[in-house]
Amino acid sequence: MYWISPNNYQVLAQETETDIEKKVLYSSKTKQIIKDNPNLITIHSHPDSFPPSIEDFNSNYENKYGLGIVITHSGIVYMYSSQEHIEPVYYKLKVDEYYLEGYNESESQIKALEYCMSHFDIYFKEVTCDARRGNGYVLRR
């Protein structure tokens, strides 16, 4: 995982080694950087190619990050942010509800996030770029 300054786009911290699968362990140095720098941009990968997890949203809120970016191993990129905590049990129930309707796991998570986005102060979007139209996302310095 990387923490990037929104002011100059410099990497302020990184945690790329972990003994726990699907978990990022923050060093004391990283914790201090997060505390001293609100609105950081975070970037991390999801090897299972799922969208941002509810834990990603809650971490974004609790750590006052400005924007989160998830890059999946299938090549899909998501951006997200959160202005409030969502109970993981609630989110899991919504995912299960969509799964029982016949959606696969990834689709169920996306549907649950869309539902939460309409009922809570969170935001997420798949990042796309249409090169023919010149539409894309560019960070400007």
Located regions from the model:
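Short beta-strand scaffold segments in enzyme catalytic cores
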Residues: 1-7, 68-71
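Divalent-metal-activated hydrolytic enzyme cores
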Residues: 65-141
